[in-house]
């Protein structure tokens, strides 16, 4: 039986930094630090008085000699290490949102890696689920009723409805909340429950990713509230154009993984 970690949470930021080819930057932990030699997303502890973004800027300048111009919240994770109980805040940095030449200022190694095809090891334990999340495209097209598609650095990524003929060969499967709640067993690499409100959100916290079907203003605002708290897995919002046109920028600035326009969803 696992015991609750009662140590104070240490606030830590890490950057998901991309290059022009859509690859992610990983660096090794330098000698003298816990887990020396393990690979991670660069970052470090948030100091008193710093925002997450300010801490990320400082850490990347100190460790790698590059300047972060813009970063967007993505996922948050809590992880218990032997040396610390950490609250990780991952910030997303696109290729045009940083400048400079990468330097190894702490004697660490660094490497550009493709989502789904990471070639460096060992990885820091807190990052295992994160690597799976990175393979999910941030741009998806389609309909919840017929399936979603996108591209990652490894190629085509298809998400099939549970009852479709393609669900056994898809990258992920969509599952109605009622079926998820009943514990329906699905043979698939990944299962994404479809939810419609904040109450259901609380019941899907062990999912690989979650699709939130937004059909009204109340649900749209609930998404904003949940994103403000931080999400631990990729959240994909599906909504009709009337909702997307109003909320897309706000959702994206707060850390939604993808916004899908689905006009089969009737606004109510």
Language-model segments: what does each one mean?
Residues 23-62:
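Conserved Nudix-box catalytic region and its N-terminal flanking loop in Nudix hydrolases
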Residues 103-160, 236, 253-261, 265-268:
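Nudix hydrolase/Nudix homology domain
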């Amino acid at each position: 039986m696992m015991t609750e970690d009662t140590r104070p949470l240490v606030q830590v930021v890490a950057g998901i930094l991309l290059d022009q080819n859509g690859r992610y930057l990983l660096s090794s932990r330098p000698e003298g630090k816990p887990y020396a030699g393990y690979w991670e997303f660069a970052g470090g502890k948030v100091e008193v008085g710093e925002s997450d973004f300010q801490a990320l800027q400082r850490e990347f300048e100190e460790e790698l000699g590059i300047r972060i111009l813009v970063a967007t919240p993505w996922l948050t994770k809590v992880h218990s290490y032997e040396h610390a109980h950490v609250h990780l805040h991952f910030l997303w940095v696109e290729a045009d949102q940083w400048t400079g030449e990468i330097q190894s200022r702490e004697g660490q190694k660094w490497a550009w890696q493709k989502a789904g095809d990471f070639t460096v090891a060992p990885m820091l334990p807190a990052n295992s689920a994160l690597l799976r999340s990175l393979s999910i495209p941030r741009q998806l097209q389609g309909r919840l009723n017929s399936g979603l598609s996108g591209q990652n650095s490894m190629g085509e990524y298809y998400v099939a409805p549970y009852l479709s003929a393609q669900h056994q060969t898809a990258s992920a499967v969509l599952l109605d909340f009622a079926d998820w709640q009943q514990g329906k067993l699905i043979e698939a690499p990944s299962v994404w429950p479809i939810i419609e409100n904040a109450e259901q959100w609380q019941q899907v916290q062990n999912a690989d990713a979650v699709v939130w079907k937004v059909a009204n203003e109340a649900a749209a605002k609930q998404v904003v509230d949940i994103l403000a708290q931080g999400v631990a897995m990729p959240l994909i919002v599906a909504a009709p154009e009337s909702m997307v046109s109003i909320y897309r920028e706000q959702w994206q600035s707060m850390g939604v993984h993808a916004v899908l326009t689905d006009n089969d969803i009737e606004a109510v």
